[in-house]
Amino acid sequence: MSKTYHFIGIKGSGMSALALMLHQMGHKVQGSDVEKYYFTQRGLEQAGITILPFSEDNITPDMELIVGNAFRENNKEVAYALRHQIPFKRYHDFLGDFMKSFISFAVAGAHGKTSTTGLLSHVLKNITDTSYLIGDGTGRGSANAQYFVFESDEYERHFMPYHPEYSIITNIDFDHPDYFTGIADVRNAFNDYAKQVKKALFVYGEDDELKKIEAPAPIYYYGFEEGNDFIAYDITRTTNGSDFKVKHQGEVIGQFHVPAYGKHNILNATAVIANLFVAGIDMALVADHLKTFSGVKRRFTEKIINDTIIIDDFAHHPTEIVATIDAARQKYPSKEIVAIFQPHTFTRTIALLEDFACALNEADSVYLAQIYGSAREVDKGEVKVEDLAAKIIKPSQVVTVENVSPLLDHDNAVYVFMGAGDIQLYEHSFEELLANLTKNNQ
């Protein structure tokens, strides 16, 4: 008889992906969360997975409880489990045990984890039976799968229970200033993680901090420059994506196309190619399936409303903002790039205020939403979004969900909405405004 898994905080991106994966493997899955809509819940609802409001009544002693990392003892279900000595596992601890049944491929790094995990999952699942867990809330489970691809998160050192066969590390950057004390602390966390990888590491070779990492397993460096073990070259970036070749030890291992934009996506693809080459996967098959990758949720997700191009992206760090704007310019070289950005957490905004301003100056015009504070912090009044606006050189202003009409002051523009909070509310307001304009003009 299959057990019942109950997820406390099932709408979290990792939690929802894991729930979907276990559901597809034949287990009974349910979960609880806040009532506010989150983009992951559509996939859960389509799978028929029950989402309940938090209640002590949801829990029975025979369930296996998996608790999202954001939920602590003040959550009524967590408190109930502790009070009645009902055991539970945190998401990362459960995952660390779960992956032992597979040959596992991890993707770690400050930026690009979800896109790279999605790309690796897409290619591998089209070649052989593969389970995967992606940070956009997408998961696939197969009881017969030999391989497992997953995203490995550094926040609060959550990746320490993981001992994968292979791991990509895309980059190291100072983020999560509410936890990490500085770049050295971040690097030390990644170094500890790297020591747990069993067969091979694939590391971006043009990242000075990453080059300091040491591990017992072989480290293969990838990038654009000579001296790397896997080198992307002969690069052509067009409005249809990116074409490039990859060589290893002086030998060409393939010519590749990815229907994705920005230099960062060429690097992500090169990391995937390097990993699969070392794992013994046929490069011709890899090239075939790279061509058909359609992206992951909330990573350069495009739609057209009333002939207006809107891009939705999870970018919430200066490095990610620069990469997203670069991708938009590659695909739409003749259009004005209008950035609509919502800072995520007060601690990150304070720590990276100057960097955010520099990154947003890559756009042609900038609109800012109010700072989205996380559940882990309190607004002490130390920073306001207007402080960021004052540092931006390009035309900029603050908008509200109720009034996004200033965005209409642009012709021939692409609107890039970026953030990890509720920036999608601003996007939906703009979409409604565009739709109403269409109705009024008919």
From Swiss-Prot:
Asked if the keyword Nucleotide-binding belongs to this entry, the reply reads yes
* A Gene Ontology cellular-component term: cytoplasm
EC annotation? 6.3.2.8
From the UniProt record, give the pathway where this protein acts.
Answer: Cell wall biogenesis; peptidoglycan biosynthesis
A GO BP term here is:
cell wall organization
Similarity comment: family membership: Belongs to the MurCDEF family.
Quote the function comment for this protein. Answer: Cell wall formation.
Its protein name is UDP-N-acetylmuramate--L-alanine ligase
| Organism the protein comes from | Streptococcus pyogenes serotype M1
